[in-house]
A protein has these predicted regions:
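Short glycine/proline-enriched turns and hinge-like loops at secondary-structure junctions
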Residues: 233, 250-253, 327-329
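Surface-exposed extracellular loop regions of Gram-negative outer-membrane beta-barrel proteins
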Residues: 50-55, 266-314, 335-350
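Membrane-embedded beta-barrel scaffold of Gram-negative outer-membrane proteins
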Residues: 96-102, 107-112, 305-350
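Alpha-helix termini
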Residues: 224-231, 264-267, 322-326
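Periplasmic-side early beta-strands and strand-to-turn transitions of outer-membrane beta-barrels
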Residues: 1-74, 112, 342
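Face-selective signature of the C-terminal outer-membrane beta-barrel domain
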Residues: 27-43, 71-249
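Membrane-embedded beta-strand positions in outer-membrane beta-barrel channels/transporters
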Residues: 19-21, 79-85, 100, 146-152, ...
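Outer-membrane beta-barrel translocator domains and adjoining extracellular loop/strand segments
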Residues: 3-9, 47-57, 61, 110-118, ...
Length: 350
């Protein structure tokens, strides 16, 4: 409330926030373990603006912008998150199997009707440069639920740590949004055509996403050595592949990656690392919204032709550990190359 009260717009700010988190772990036997993570968050934002007074321009040309408001804004953001994992260690003590389930749900409401009458004046002469009114309206509702079920296994031996998993994700999102902004300047509607009445901004969106993702990965972390048995060169090779399929756009992705860490025997204070891989960033609801404008009204629809953003990484790095002034230091250097493609731009509301 104190931060909001320092803004240029004076008014009555009433934010309320609730956040509850919990983590529980139960191990009935040496081979079974149950873990639970929960989070509840709710944020109410109530705002009734009164006036705003802003000075801007140069020292020789100062202007004053003053607004008086009517109306209010009421927002609600509520989220629930739950995560449950059941892990079983096999008798060989090298293999474990986990069944993991999680669910995330959110409800968002942005509602406001605010009208403002404004005056723009020249500070030195009190000359009236402009007068007008505007009205902003919004009824935005969003509900989303994302559920996951994951089966994961791990196996550790003397030189290998193998991990693999299969995952199914359910996505359900419903959006119903209506926004507009009306401006009137000295008796003329803006924009003014002389014939039709248009809003300077109008948005309508009614969308529903019902999709499923299927994902999986398999990777191995291999430790080995070469050279002199007394002071060998140490290697850590990590390699794997990840796959994913999304039935919303029918896209199937395969993402291999590999990295190698080397600690040379001739100087254990040095460490080298090289890595490469093909990475994808799958879109979600925000990136799916595609807008088209017809007769002054912007409509938001979901783009089923969208594709995941893609990047090829090449990385080389070096670490050098040393002591100076009786203190430990580490010098690190890294060079990387990223080839980005299929980027998805979108607008962020500020």
């Amino acid at each position: 409330r104190y931060v909001l009260g320092s803004l240029e717009t004076n008014g009555e700010y009433k934010p309320n926030f609730l956040d509850y988190q919990t983590y529980l772990s139960w191990q009935p036997t040496k081979r079974w373990q149950l873990d639970l993570i929960g989070n509840i968050s709710e944020n109410h934002y109530n705002f009734r603006p009164e006036d705003r007074n802003t000075n801007f321009g140069t020292m020789e040309n100062v202007k004053n912008f003053q607004v008086y408001f009517d109306g209010q804004e009421k927002d609600l953001f509520r989220t629930f998150f739950g995560w449950l994992a059941l892990t079983h260690k096999l008798k060989d003590n090298k293999t474990s199997v986990s069944l993991i389930g999680s669910i995330f749900t959110t409800k968002e409401q942005e509602r406001y009707d605010i009208q403002g009458q404004y005056w723009l004046t020249q500070t030195e002469t009190s000359e009236n440069l402009g007068v007008g009114t505007y009205m902003q309206h919004s009824r935005d509702y969003l509900k989303a639920t994302v559920g996951n079920v994951k089966l994961m296994t791990r196996r550790t031996t003397d030189h290998h740590h193998v991990e693999g998993a299969l995952l199914w994700r359910m996505e359900r999102v419903t959006e119903n949004s209506a926004e507009y902004e009306y401006r009137d300047s000295a008796g003329y509607n803006v924009p003014h055509t002389g014939k039709d009445l248009y809003m300077i901004y109008s948005l309508r969106a009614r969308n529903e996403l019902r999709a499923n993702r299927f994902e999986g990965y398999l990777q191995d972390n291999w430790n080995f050595r070469t050279g002199n048995d007394s002071v060998p060169t140490l290697y850590t090779l990590n390699y794997g592949v990840r796959f994913a399929h999304w039935n919303f756009n029918g896209e199937t992705l395969i993402s291999p990656r590999v990295s190698l860490n080397i600690v040379p025997g001739w100087n254990r204070n040095l460490a080298f690392r090289v890595a490469t891989g093909l990475y994808y960033q799958a879109p979600f609801f925000k990136e799916l919204r595609d807008t088209t404008t017809l007769n002054g009204v912007t409509y938001a629809k979901l783009n089923q032709k969208i594709r995941s953003q893609r990047s090829i990484h090449l990385v080389g790095a070096m670490d050098y550990s040393f002591r100076m002034l009786d203190r430990p230091f580490k010098f690190s250097a890294e060079i990387y190359y990223k080839m980005l493609s299929r980027l998805t731009p979108y607008v962020v509301d500020l």
